[in-house]
Amino acid sequence: MTRNLEKKMSIREDAQQGKVTPLFEQCAAVESMSVERLMAGVSDGTIAITKNKNHAFSKVIAIGAGTSTKVNANLGSSKDINSLEEELKKLAVAIKAGADTIMDLSMGGDLQKIRQEILKNCSVPLGTVPIYQVAAEVVAAGKEIVDMTVERMFEVIEQQAKDGVDFMTIHCGINRHLQERLKNQPRTMGVVSRGGSFTLDWMNHHKRENPMYEYFDDLLAILKEHEVTLSLGDGIRPGCLADATDRNQIQELITLGELTERAWAAGVQVIVEGPGHMPLNQIKANVLLQKQMCKGAPFYVLGPLVTDIAPGYDHITGAIGGAIAASAGADYLCYVTPAEHLKLPNCSDVHEGVIASKIAAHAADIVKGLPGAIEKDNAMAKCRKELDWKGQIELSIDPAKSAQYRHEGGGDATDACSMCGEFCALKVFERSQK
């Protein structure tokens, strides 16, 4: 392998050519793996490094085989609630809680300004869904979503790439064939992906192919120029347990697998998105299907949410599914907040969502046998045995909450807790051994 400090356009091509760069060295160090192994993963597409050449940030990450399970936090304004100040607060909360990436899903207010300010303040990779901006613009102009133009779709993608967006969710897997299949196999909830529904609405109205599928090569050219990772959106993901793993979902996945290989051939890195709502016993099979269909490309799942009846607690339903999915081989969890299905999340919701998904990711990393994962739990066990409360708080996934609960329980002045006090099992056992 050769040493090369020059900035190259394509991270994937650098890896394929065996050119060691500071980016590869930094990611390998974070993941406790050799540079050679990391580069082999980037070369064969099983690892993606989401880093736009126009975005300077401090926390570069690798997503995929052999790396720690990553967590994404979604932010963004809505038409009804659009405060840049609030979104920047959410950004800070998400990053402090441990989010590895951020997605700006804004659809209200000055979208360009919101995105650029988030980019400026974002110390981790930032993703977007460009069709959101296109749809929001036409609606703000008093028109309908179907009035989006192909030209504007590509203009927005290119502008966001130039601004520094690191990865983009684009629903390329929806095509005319899948459109007909949806008519032939009705669903309980139809299509729940906003980007997917916008795309299908446009296709139905214009009787045309999905522009992101039809002009896929043009899309790849833009993404490669700016080193944007393509996150292939699952526009037909199931929105309820009843729709999970149906023919519609799997047909889109087959298409995403084909598009993955085309993107790789063009020198573009790929992440593949997945469900969604899904019963526990279907999650492992879905991960296996994605890994087979998409040749091991990193798998990015929303949850999955394992029940439909827990609004207000969907950060828990999502964490349960996320732990199972990641332990089965999924690489990247999109967080779910307690506000899911109910409202736009606030700062508290964002914090709770990130922590829940970080717990799921860590639990999966233990199963994956990743370096340093179980060691954290072993260190916690040692602190608990020794009643080292300071150590326990420092090791916890949410130190502030641990400290708060300890204080509220009156534990500051004792080595026990208010649950057991003098009946502490650890103390009794220790005494019995003397």
From Swiss-Prot:
Its cofactor is [4Fe-4S] cluster. Pathway: Cofactor biosynthesis; thiamine diphosphate biosynthesis. Catalyzes the synthesis of the hydroxymethylpyrimidine phosphate (HMP-P) moiety of thiamine from aminoimidazole ribotide (AIR) in a radical S-adenosyl-L-methionine (SAM)-dependent reaction. GO terms for biological process: thiamine biosynthetic process; thiamine diphosphate biosynthetic process. Keywords: 4Fe-4S, Iron, Iron-sulfur, Lyase, Metal-binding, S-adenosyl-L-methionine, Thiamine biosynthesis, Zinc. Zn(2+) binds at H277, H341. This is Phosphomethylpyrimidine synthase. Belongs to the ThiC family. Coiled coil: none annotated. Its EC number is 4.1.99.17. The keyword Flavoprotein does not apply. Homodimer. One of its GO terms (cellular component) is cytosol. Substrate binds at N74, M103, Y132, H171, S193, R194, G195, D234, G235, I236, R237, E273, Y300. It catalyses: 5-amino-1-(5-phospho-beta-D-ribosyl)imidazole + S-adenosyl-L-methionine = 4-amino-2-methyl-5-(phosphooxymethyl)pyrimidine + CO + 5'-deoxyadenosine + formate + L-methionine + 3 H(+). Binds 1 [4Fe-4S] cluster per subunit. The cluster is coordinated with 3 cysteines and an exchangeable S-adenosyl-L-methionine. Gene3D superfamilies: 6.10.250.620, Radical SAM ThiC family, central domain.
